[in-house]
Each structure stands twice: as C-alpha cells, then as structure tokens.
Amino acid sequence: ACLDRIKLREPDVQAWAYLDPDYAMAQARAADVQLKEGKGVGPLHGVPVGIKDVIDTADMPTENGSKLFAGRRPATDSTIAKLLRDAGAVIMGKTVTTEFALSAPGKTKNPHDLTRTPGGSSQGSAAGVADYQMALSVGSQTGGSMIRPASFCGIYGYKPTFGTISRAGMCPLARPLDHPGVYGRTLADLALIADVLMVSDPADLDMRANPGAG
C-alpha cells in the first residue's frame, strides 16, 4: 500500500531522497516469512519507516542533502538504523532534508497544499508520513527541524530530551543542540518507535544514562 501511494504521489510531494521499491519489498517478504515460521518478531515488525538523509544506512546512500556527498554510501549503520532493523522495521529509504539539515531548501512539497512548504529541515520525513507514504519516520532537530514540519504537515512529531536517542552515525550540525526525533500519525505510533530508539549508546558521549526513563 505504501509503495502504491508513493507511485501515485511522489512525483508531486517529493518526500524521498532515495527509494528502492524492490529492496523495500524484499524486506517485507522476509518479514512475512519470519512471521510464518513462528520466529520471534520485534515491536516494529514489517512496519514501513523512512530515515532522514543525515542518518547513516549501510545499504543505502546517505548524502546529507548535499551534492558534496553525492553517492556516499556509509560502511556501517547508524545506531538508529541498527535499532530499527533489530526491531523488524522495513526501512523504505532516505527522506529529503535541507542541505546538512540547515541551509539550501529541499524539493519536498506540503502534501496538503503543493504550493506550500512542509517546513524544514526534516521535510521529507514529515511530508511522507502525512501523505501515508510510510507509517513512521525519523528526523532530527537542531533549531526547529522536528516540530516545525510536524506542525506544517499536520502530524505528530516528538523531539525528545537531549541525550535520549543516539546520534552516532548522524551528520553533526551543533553537538549541544542536535536531537534525533520521530514522526507518526498517532501518539501511540510515536510511543512505539520512540521506545525502540531510546536505548543507551556509548558511541554518543552525550547520551543519558537511562534514556527510556521518565
């Protein structure tokens, strides 16, 4: 259903920086097989998720919204991507960001009115969820880059307390202010993905000792 929606709407909304439908389907089929075989499943088993293009994924480009990083393919996953995979998520692709989550505007349009901005910098993540192209997504905020797109696109966005979600493998902008965050269409959806990502990570020196508490 998500891929059908993307085929219909992506030419207008332009939420994706990178999308491989065949790979997305391969992940979904593998999730189906795992379920049929009675193997253990995670809290996001088979759920389609998008990741902002400033967060590393080993099997997809991460270009930070910049021509300077065109074609860049990280050798390893970010902590966020690894946690999502371990939870069973289907990582659909990478969502559009302004350049380095700061400067040159991205191509994404507001799905409710294509003449309007979806907000930035996490524009693709918010617009894609609002347009039903994915169920959940991950963005980031240094100034207002999570809460602004959520407001503009009419969905729920959660920017948690600093040090709650690991930034290991995320393009840095301002260390004291960089926050990963999540988008969903319901509060229950936000809680589901946030619980997966709120895990202490020694690779991020600013992580709280018990990020899931409180």
Describe each model-derived feature in a short phrase.
Residues 1-143:
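Gly/Ser-rich catalytic/binding loops embedded in alpha/beta enzyme cores
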Residues 159-214:
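A short helix-breaking turn/cap at a secondary-structure junction
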Residues 131, 142-168:
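Glycine/threonine-rich beta-strand-loop-alpha-helix active-site module
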Residues 75-79, 122-123, 153, 185-188, ...:
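Residues forming well-ordered secondary-structure scaffolds
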Residues 25, 155-157, 182:
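Conserved hydrophobic/aromatic beta-strand scaffold that supports enzyme active sites
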